[in-house]
From Swiss-Prot:
GO biological process, one term: translation
Gene designation: rps14
Intracellular or extracellular location(s): Plastid, Chloroplast
Task of the protein: Binds 16S rRNA, required for the assembly of 30S particles.
Keywords: Chloroplast, Plastid, Ribonucleoprotein, Ribosomal protein, RNA-binding, rRNA-binding
Entries under InterPro entries matching the protein: Ribosomal_uS14 (IPR001209), Ribosomal_uS14_bac/plastid (IPR023036), Ribosomal_uS14_CS (IPR018271)
Source taxonomy: Eukaryota, Viridiplantae, Streptophyta, Embryophyta, Tracheophyta
UniProt protein name: Small ribosomal subunit protein uS14c
Principal location listed in the UniProt entry: plastid
Pfam family, one: Ribosomal_S14
Gene Ontology molecular function, alphabetical: rRNA binding; structural constituent of ribosome
Family membership noted in the UniProt record: Belongs to the universal ribosomal protein uS14 family.
Species this protein is from: Oenothera argillicola (Appalachian evening primrose)
Quaternary organization: Part of the 30S ribosomal subunit.
Domain of life: Eukaryota
GO cellular component, one term: chloroplast
Length: 100
């Protein structure tokens, strides 16, 4: 299980990303439509003044039950081994074991 501090840090990043999402999108759109290089630099400076953790690339998906950052399935928000255990226990409706 992941440390609680790592999970809280990730939640903080999610909140910051949602808060600054529109600001970052509008700034990037302004940069692409700015006619001169000096205006692009000014807009870029405004974009850089936003917090580093507000960038969407800083987010990392985590398993909501264990906090594991790797091998996550997007549809279930679970890591692989927890997903397997829950499917075997019939806790996920619609998920079946594969056999071939």
């Amino acid at each position: 299980m992941a440390r609680k501090g790592l999970i809280q840090r990730e939640k903080k990043r999610e909140k910051l990303e949602q808060k600054y999402r529109l600001i970052r999108r509008s700034s990037k759109k302004e940069i692409s439509t700015a006619p001169s290089l000096s205006e692009k630099w000014k807009i870029h400076g405004k974009l850089q003044s936003s917090p580093r953790n507000s960038a969407p690339t800083r987010l990392h998906r985590r398993c909501f039950s264990t906090g594991r950052p790797r091998a996550n399935y997007r549809d279930f928000r679970l890591s692989g081994h927890i997903l397997r255990e829950m499917v075997h226990a019939c806790l996920l409706p619609g998920a079946t074991r594969s056999s071939w």
